[in-house]
């Protein structure tokens, strides 16, 4: 007899980095892949290098407790984050520390604790950082007046992984921006007039069932028990229908993210860009 499938376990994981977050994301996903039916709810914080930035991060952690994985070189910031989490019994893991400590013992040399020390300061690095800065400045509909300078613009309703997909693309030196599709809120005027010479526009599609599941888990993580229109199945279906009609009307390319990881979605977008740019 087939054993019934165990229900999925959802938990918050906060990834705090003073650099691009690429290392943290790779390690976290590799670790979670070792567990069946485990669904981490990722909260990503990139380029955290000041007290003010850390303050915002800690407020987010307090609002949705879970586990905290971090790569922060600054001793004062590390101390604040660790003390904050310790006072609230929130587990923390400085993911690079074991590897750095082992190398230090083996080589007999103290680490220099450079921020983003894993990145060589070469042309490739600066191109990546330029893309990351562009992406962070054009996240969630910000600075739309300069969004025309993007390589790709992602459109999608709330909770379709627009931001993490853009950050992943930025780590591949792609200038990515995203605009949330909100019922009743029009897109910037230039979006429907760009034609083939503007940025690649990709609509992120998702099934209503999957989106309802994600949004309800999001409400649970924020300790909100009431099912609002945000997670109501009928309202979600209407929202998705409007988005799909918009994509079709403008002839924009689409990717269904219902069961895709961020990496898979980004890979599909990179393929579209390579076709457009004439790369193999």
Swiss-Prot record:
**InterPro entries from the UniProt entry:** Kinase-pyrophosphorylase (IPR005177), PPDK_reg (IPR026565)
Q: Its biological function? A: Bifunctional serine/threonine kinase and phosphorylase involved in the regulation of the pyruvate, phosphate dikinase (PPDK) by catalyzing its phosphorylation/dephosphorylation.
Organism equals Hyphomonas neptunium (strain ATCC 15444)
Q: Which reaction does it catalyse?
A: N(tele)-phospho-L-histidyl/L-threonyl-[pyruvate, phosphate dikinase] + ADP = N(tele)-phospho-L-histidyl/O-phospho-L-threonyl-[pyruvate, phosphate dikinase] + AMP + H(+); N(tele)-phospho-L-histidyl/O-phospho-L-threonyl-[pyruvate, phosphate dikinase] + phosphate + H(+) = N(tele)-phospho-L-histidyl/L-threonyl-[pyruvate, phosphate dikinase] + diphosphate
Q: Where does ADP bind?
A: 156-163
- Single GO MF annotation: phosphotransferase activity, phosphate group as acceptor
Please tell me whether the keyword Kinase is annotated for this protein.
Answer: yes
Q: Which family does it belong to?
A: Belongs to the pyruvate, phosphate/water dikinase regulatory protein family. PDRP subfamily.
Keyword Kinase appears in the UniProt entry: yes
* Name of the protein described by the UniProt record: Putative pyruvate, phosphate dikinase regulatory protein
Q: What is its EC number?
A: 2.7.11.32, 2.7.4.27
The alphabetized UniProt keywords are:
Kinase, Nucleotide-binding, Serine/threonine-protein kinase, Transferase
